[in-house]
Amino acid sequence: MADSPSPAPQPPQPPAPTTHTGSPTDFLKGVVGKRVVVRLLSGVDYRGILSCLDGYMNIAMEQTEESVNGKVVNRYGDAFIRGNNVLYISADEPI
């Protein structure tokens, strides 16, 4: 009886993607009119409906809540955020 070498363990497989693939432009077009979270470089979050944005990432939002450390500190009907302050934009609801 010859000892056969055991097969080498396989490296773990990356998890299956849970989001749609596409360009950032496709994502941004898809979230206009939807609820989003905008995180600023300062760490402040704005949650609301994305009205529009431009090529400089300047953002207009409606029904906006400003949160610091997870706590809502202000509510605005409309909010305008200058793009150079934006760290990221994420969907706050399925797209």
Curated annotation (Swiss-Prot):
Ranges where the Sm domain occurs: 23-95
InterPro entries: Lsm6/sSmF, LSM_dom_sf, Sm, Sm_dom_euk/arc
Compositional bias segments (type: Pro residues): 1-17
Alphabetized UniProt keyword annotations: Cytoplasm, mRNA processing, mRNA splicing, Nucleus, Ribonucleoprotein, RNA-binding, rRNA processing, Spliceosome, tRNA processing
Pfam assignment, any one: LSM
Cellular compartment(s): Cytoplasm; Nucleus
GO molecular function terms noted in the UniProt entry: RNA binding
Cellular component annotations (GO), alphabetically ordered: nucleolus; P-body; sno(s)RNA-containing ribonucleoprotein complex; spliceosomal complex; U4/U6 x U5 tri-snRNP complex; U6 snRNP
Gene Ontology BP annotations: maturation of SSU-rRNA; mRNA splicing, via spliceosome; tRNA processing
Main subcellular location of this protein, as a coarse class: cytoplasm
Assembly information from the UniProt record: Component of the heptameric LSM1-LSM7 complex, which consists of LSM1, LSM2, LSM3, LSM4, LSM5, LSM6 and LSM7. Component of the heptameric LSM2-LSM8 complex, which consists of LSM2, LSM3, LSM4, LSM5, LSM6, LSM7 and LSM8. The LSm subunits form a seven-membered ring structure with a doughnut shape.
Function noted in UniProt: Component of LSm protein complexes, which are involved in RNA processing and may function in a chaperone-like manner, facilitating the efficient association of RNA processing factors with their substrates. Component of the cytoplasmic LSM1-LSM7 complex, which is thought to be involved in mRNA degradation by activating the decapping step in the 5'-to-3' mRNA decay pathway. Component of the nuclear LSM2-LSM8 complex, which is involved in splicing of nuclear mRNAs.
Protein family: Belongs to the snRNP Sm proteins family. SmF/LSm6 subfamily.
Name of the protein this chain belongs to: U6 snRNA-associated Sm-like protein LSm6
Species for this entry: Coprinopsis cinerea (strain Okayama-7 / 130 / ATCC MYA-4618 / FGSC 9003)
Gene transcribed to yield this protein: LSM6
